[in-house]
Amino acid sequence: DVQLQESGPGLVKPSQSLSLTCTVTGYSITSDYAWNWIRQFPGNKLEWVGYITYSGSTNYNPSLKSRISITRDTSKNQFFLQFNSVTSEDTATYFCARSWFAYWGQGTLVTVSSAKTTPPSVYPLAP
C-alpha cells in the first residue's frame, strides 16, 4: 500500500526558512506520477503549492514560485519543500500527495510565529 508521511519543524519564526519532508513508502517516486505539496489554511481553504515529477522536473504555484523549491532524495524515497521568507500567512497544515491525489499524507501543522514555544496539542486532565 502507498503511504506518505510529512515531517517538519512545527514552529517557524517570521522571515526564516521552512523545510518539510515527505517520506513515501510502498511506491518509488522515480517510477511515475507527480509528487505534490498542498497546504490547508485555517478555515479549510486548500492551496496547491507545487510538485516534482518522477523524472525530477518541477512545477510551482505562480504566486509562490519566488519563495519555494521542491527537491528530492531518490535514495531515501523522499521529497522536500523549502519555503523561504515565511510570514504568518504561511501558517497552515502542509500535505504531500501523489497525483491524481489518490494518496495523501496526514499533514503537518506549521505555525509561523515569533513565540518561543508551541502550545501543547494535548492537555492533561486533572486527577
How would you describe each model-predicted region?
Residues 1-127:
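Extracellular domains of the immunoglobulin superfamily
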